[in-house]
């Protein structure tokens, strides 16, 4: 996603 935690890069970036 954008500024979320727990999502992968394939989700839309924002791995932090």
Swiss-Prot record:
Post-translational modification: Conversion of fibrinogen to fibrin is triggered by thrombin, which cleaves fibrinopeptides A and B from alpha and beta chains, and thus exposes the N-terminal polymerization sites responsible for the formation of the soft clot. The soft clot is converted into the hard clot by factor XIIIA which catalyzes the epsilon-(gamma-glutamyl)lysine cross-linking between gamma chains (stronger) and between alpha chains (weaker) of different monomers. Forms F13A-mediated cross-links between a glutamine and the epsilon-amino group of a lysine residue, forming fibronectin-fibrinogen heteropolymers.
Keywords, alphabetical: Adaptive immunity, Blood coagulation, Coiled coil, Disulfide bond, Hemostasis, Immunity, Innate immunity, Secreted
GO BP, sorted A to Z: adaptive immune response; blood coagulation; innate immune response
Compartment(s) where it occurs, according to its Swiss-Prot or TrEMBL record: Secreted
Gene Ontology CC annotation, any one: extracellular region
Keyword Zinc annotated: no
Domain notes: A long coiled coil structure formed by 3 polypeptide chains connects the central nodule to the C-terminal domains (distal nodules). The long C-terminal ends of the alpha chains fold back, contributing a fourth strand to the coiled coil structure.
SUBUNIT field: Heterohexamer; disulfide linked. Contains 2 sets of 3 non-identical chains (alpha, beta and gamma). The 2 heterotrimers are in head to head conformation with the N-termini in a small central domain.
Biological role stated in the UniProt entry: Cleaved by the protease thrombin to yield monomers which, together with fibrinogen beta (FGB) and fibrinogen gamma (FGG), polymerize to form an insoluble fibrin matrix. Fibrin has a major function in hemostasis as one of the primary components of blood clots. In addition, functions during the early stages of wound repair to stabilize the lesion and guide cell migration during re-epithelialization. Was originally thought to be essential for platelet aggregation, based on in vitro studies using anticoagulated blood.
Protein name, as recorded: Fibrinogen alpha chain
